[in-house]
């Protein structure tokens, strides 16, 4: 019984990690905000994108 529980817990942990890494590239006019916890997007300099529109998306570590 403990073995099944351990396998289930480990599987759920891996699934949570996988879901956390599935993120969206920042839209055009937005860049990754490295100072933000969770790596959100922010308007790039000279862009007319609003901060609200950029904050709707997040970026993964590979795109920052």
Swiss-Prot record:
GO terms for cellular component: extracellular region. It is found in: Secreted. Contains 3 disulfide bonds. Belongs to the scolopendra neurotoxin 6 family. Expressed by the venom gland. The keyword Disulfide bond applies. Keywords: Disulfide bond, Neurotoxin, Secreted, Signal, Toxin. It comes from the Eukaryota. Its main location: secreted. This is Putative neurotoxin 4. Residues 1-18 form the signal peptide. GO terms for molecular function: toxin activity.
């Amino acid at each position: 019984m403990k073995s099944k529980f351990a396998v289930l817990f480990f599987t759920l942990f891996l699934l949570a990690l996988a879901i956390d890494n599935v993120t969206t590239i920042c839209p055009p006019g937005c860049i990754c905000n490295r100072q933000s916890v969770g790596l959100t997007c922010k308007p790039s300099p000279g862009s007319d994108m609003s901060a609200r529109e950029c904050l709707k998306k997040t970026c993964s570590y590979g795109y920052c």
